[in-house]
């Protein structure tokens, strides 16, 4: 009898909340968009391996924006640069909150910048900014970190060239490079490029990304049936890897002689007034956040950039010529503007293969209005609290209305007086990644060294596939190429 009553109550809740709610809040039901099924929403219309391409299909059909349900979540997808600016930048206070899935929240535990509330995010970001503004490292020390870790990478690639008849698969080496850079930045400790700790950290970052993708993230009704033991387990595993280094710095910390990013974060904790908003318990999460976010985004950009340069010898040669013409063997960050072609090429790779083709969604925390001049039908819409806002960077990046010959790799679109359509590297608005400038600087130094030292050629002159797949981020099929060491004389 009791079981029957429970089933009836759950059924009523299910029908009320999930089957009858198909975008009926405020103006959402008026917004055009695909048909949404109960529970699934429009997930049926998406290709799992080419998720970003499915957005292109709706872009062509609905233009500026449309309503869609991802599982049980109401979403407005913004397609036009004008509309993205209007909502995400001009009304940023109303869409400040991130959408955090139950999996991300479980990983974050209230102490990670990747999965915290707006108030917590402001607190954590302010802490990071203050830590690094006090940081005496500056550009010169970052230059040293990037160059030192790159040199280990270069020597490793030379060994692979000799042992594999010049055939190298670069993706795993780029990942090791980013891990070694982040580790050195955090702890001021050098690891050998083949140190098992690098691979262990890499495995953990990939496990965390993979484990934070569960059915309950899109369909909360299944959350009570979901286990998060895998997330808890890999977080403990990764913490165990960094714990010895963290404990060492906590014991040996010299307040007057900070040597690395961790030292400066410890100083910042000590400088806080009571009660302390940030404690030592936050430190492991800051360290893990940087490994997880930095490795996937930066290494993936390195992989795509080198792949496209391998297919474009003329462009590869142009970049090397620019590097040689400036005449600086070891480029430094202060000289970055002397390399317009390289900088523009990095922007162009982010346009063609954005790591996050669909920019991280925001949650409407105050009702927002989509002004009628951006509406295809000349209307205005009030978007209610709780709706997800999804900026669709990928589709307008390939729209000839905004980019001439959008399928062509053409860095000239970002050089000189050419107008720049809204360019989104990893994100946009006030909730951008606090380490974004670190990643851009890292890419500049690595590429400035890489294309002076090596030439990349397709194997047997067969162009490498540039087809993109969505697996956590946009990535190519695994590829290899011929790597030829250049003569610096």
From Swiss-Prot:
Pfam families: p450. Its cofactor is heme. Keywords: Heme, Iron, Membrane, Metal-binding, Monooxygenase, Oxidoreductase, Transmembrane, Transmembrane helix. It is a single-pass membrane protein. GO terms for biological process: organic acid metabolic process; xenobiotic metabolic process. Its EC number is 1.14.-.-. It comes from the Eukaryota. It is found in: Membrane. Belongs to the cytochrome P450 family. This is Probable cytochrome P450 522A1.
């Amino acid at each position: 009898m009791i079981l029957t009553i429970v089933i009836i109550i759950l059924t009523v809740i299910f029908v009320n909340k999930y089957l009858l709610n198909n975008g009926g809040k405020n103006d959402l039901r008026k917004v055009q968009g695909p048909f949404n099924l109960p529970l699934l929403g429009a997930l049926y219309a998406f290709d799992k391996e080419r998720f970003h391409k499915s957005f292109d299909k709706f872009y062509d059909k609905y233009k500026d924006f449309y309503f869609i349900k991802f599982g049980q979540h109401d979403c407005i997808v913004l397609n036009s640069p004008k509309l993205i600016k209007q909502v995400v930048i001009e009304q940023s206070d109303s869409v400040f909150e991130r959408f955090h899935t139950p999996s991300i929240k479980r990983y974050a535990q209230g102490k990670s910048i990747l999965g915290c509330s707006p108030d917590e995010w402001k607190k954590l970001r302010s802490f990071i900014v203050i830590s690094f503004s006090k940081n005496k490292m500056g550009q010169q020390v970052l230059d040293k970190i990037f160059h030192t870790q790159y040199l280990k990478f270069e020597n490793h690639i030379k060994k692979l060239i000799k042992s594999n008849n010049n055939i190298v698969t670069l993706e795993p080496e780029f990942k090791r490079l980013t891990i070694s850079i982040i580790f050195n930045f955090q702890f001021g400790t050098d690891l050998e490029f083949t140190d098992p700790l690098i691979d262990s950290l890499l495995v953990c970052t990939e496990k965390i990304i993979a484990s934070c993708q569960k059915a309950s993230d899109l369909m909360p009704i299944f959350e009570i049936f979901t286990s998060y033991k895998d997330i808890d387990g890999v977080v403990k595993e990764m913490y165990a890897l960094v714990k010895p280094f963290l404990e060492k710095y906590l014991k040996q910390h010299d307040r007057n002689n900070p040597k690395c990013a961790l030292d400066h974060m410890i100083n910042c904790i000590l400088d806080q007034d009571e009660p302390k908003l940030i404690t030592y318990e936050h430190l492991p999460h800051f360290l893990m956040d940087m490994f997880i976010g930095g490795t996937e985004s930066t290494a993936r950009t390195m992989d795509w950039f080198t792949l496209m340069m391998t297919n474009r010898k003329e462009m590869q040669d142009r970049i090397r010529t620019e590097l040689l013409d400036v005449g600086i063997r070891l480029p430094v960050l202060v000289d970055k503007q002397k390399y317009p072609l390289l900088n523009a090429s990095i922007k162009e790779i982010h346009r063609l293969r954005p790591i996050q083709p669909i920019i991280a969604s925001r949650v409407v925390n105050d009702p927002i209005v989509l002004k009628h001049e951006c509406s295809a039908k000349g209307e205005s819409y009030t978007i209610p609290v709780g709706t997800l806002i999804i900026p669709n960077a990928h589709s307008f990046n390939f729209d000839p209305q905004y980019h001439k010959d959008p399928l062509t790799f053409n860095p000239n679109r970002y050089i000189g007086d050419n107008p720049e359509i809204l360019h989104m590297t990893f994100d946009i608005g006030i909730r951008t990644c606090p380490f974004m400038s670190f990643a851009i600087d890292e890419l500049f130094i690595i590429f400035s060294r890489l294309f002076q030292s090596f030439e990349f050629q397709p194997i047997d002159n067969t162009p490498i596939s540039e087809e993109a797949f969505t697996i956590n981020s946009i990535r190519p099929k695994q590829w290899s190429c011929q790597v030829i060491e250049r003569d610096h004389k």
